[in-house]
C-alpha cells in the first residue's frame, strides 16, 4: 500500500509538472520574437557607438536612443495588444494568474523588458527599471548619469495614477526633494527642464492629489 501511495503521489506531481511546462510554453508563444529581437539589436548598436564616444556625444546618443526606443516599444505593444488588453479577462485565453505573470516576465527579462501594470487594468510592455542607467552610466556626463540613476529608482515603483496615489506622502516629498537637489546641483543641465517638470508633478500630487482623487474635496484640475 505504501508503495502504491508513493506511485500515485509521484504520478500526480509528474502530471502537474507537465501541465505547468505546457502552460509556460503557451505563454512564451504569445510573444513575437522578431519585434523583441529588434529591441535587443538596437541596444547592441547603441552600445557599440558609446564605446567610441566622448561624454557629450554619449549624452546626444542617449537622447536619440530614448526617442527611437519609444517607437520600438510602441511597436512591441501594438504587436501584443490583444494579449495585453485581456490579461485581466478571465474569459480570455490570455488571462494571467500571478504565476503566469511571473513566467512571462522571466522570459521578457531576457530582453530587458517586463510587463508592467500601470494600475486600473492598464498593462504595457516596458523596459526594466534600470535599463537606461545600466547602458549609459559609464559614458555620459555627470548630470545625465545622476538623472538616469534617479529615474531608474523611480521606475521601480509606481508613485501615482490618475485614480490614486500609491505611496506615502513622505515618499512624494522625498521625490520632490531629490529633483530640487538635482536642479540646484546642475542648474544649467540640458535635463533641467525635465527635472523641473518632475518637480512640478510632485508638487501638484503632494498638494492636490491625483486627478481623480484630489485632496481638496470636489476640486479637480
Locate each region found by the language model.
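Sec-dependent N-terminal signal peptides of Gram-positive bacterial secreted proteins and lipoproteins
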Residues: 1-17
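N-terminal Sec/ER secretory leader and immediately downstream segment
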Residues: 23-128
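Solvent-exposed, acidic/flexible segments
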Residues: 97, 101, 125, 129, ...
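Short coil/linker segments at helix-helix boundaries
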Residues: 131-132, 145-173, 205-221
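Short solvent-exposed coil/turn linkers within tandem alpha-helical repeat scaffolds
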Residues: 134-142, 182-194
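Amphipathic alpha-helices of TPR/Sel1-like and other helical repeat/solenoid scaffolds
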Residues: 172-185
Amino acid at each position: 500500500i505504501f508503495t502504491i501511495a508513493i506511485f500515485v503521489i509521484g504520478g500526480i506531481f509528474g502530471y502537474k509538472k507537465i501541465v505547468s511546462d505546457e502552460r509556460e510554453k503557451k505563454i512564451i508563444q504569445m510573444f513575437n520574437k522578431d519585434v523583441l529581437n529588434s529591441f535587443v539589436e538596437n541596444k547592441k548598436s547603441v552600445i557599440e557607438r558609446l564605446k567610441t564616444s566622448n561624454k557629450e556625444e554619449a549624452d546626444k546618443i542617449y537622447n536619440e536612443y530614448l526617442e527611437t526606443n519609444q517607437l520600438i516599444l510602441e511597436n512591441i505593444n501594438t504587436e501584443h495588444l490583444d494579449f495585453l488588453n485581456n490579461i485581466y479577462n478571465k474569459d480570455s485565453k490570455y488571462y494571467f494568474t500571478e504565476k503566469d505573470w511571473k513566467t512571462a516576465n522571466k522570459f521578457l527579462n531576457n530582453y530587458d523588458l517586463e510587463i508592467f501594470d500601470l494600475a486600473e487594468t492598464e498593462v504595457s510592455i516596458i523596459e526594466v527599471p534600470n535599463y537606461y542607467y545600466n547602458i549609459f552610466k559609464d559614458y555620459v556626463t555627470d548630470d545625465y548619469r545622476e538623472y538616469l540613476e534617479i529615474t531608474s529608482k523611480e521606475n521601480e515603483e509606481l508613485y501615482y495614477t490618475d485614480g490614486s496615489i500609491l505611496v506615502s506622502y513622505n515618499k512624494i516629498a522625498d521625490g520632490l526633494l531629490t529633483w530640487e537637489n538635482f536642479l540646484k546641483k546642475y542648474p544649467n543641465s540640458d535635463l533641467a527642464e525635465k527635472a523641473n517638470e518632475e518637480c512640478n508633478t510632485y508638487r501638484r500630487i503632494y498638494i492636490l492629489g491625483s486627478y481623480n482623487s484630489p485632496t481638496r474635496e470636489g476640486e479637480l484640475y
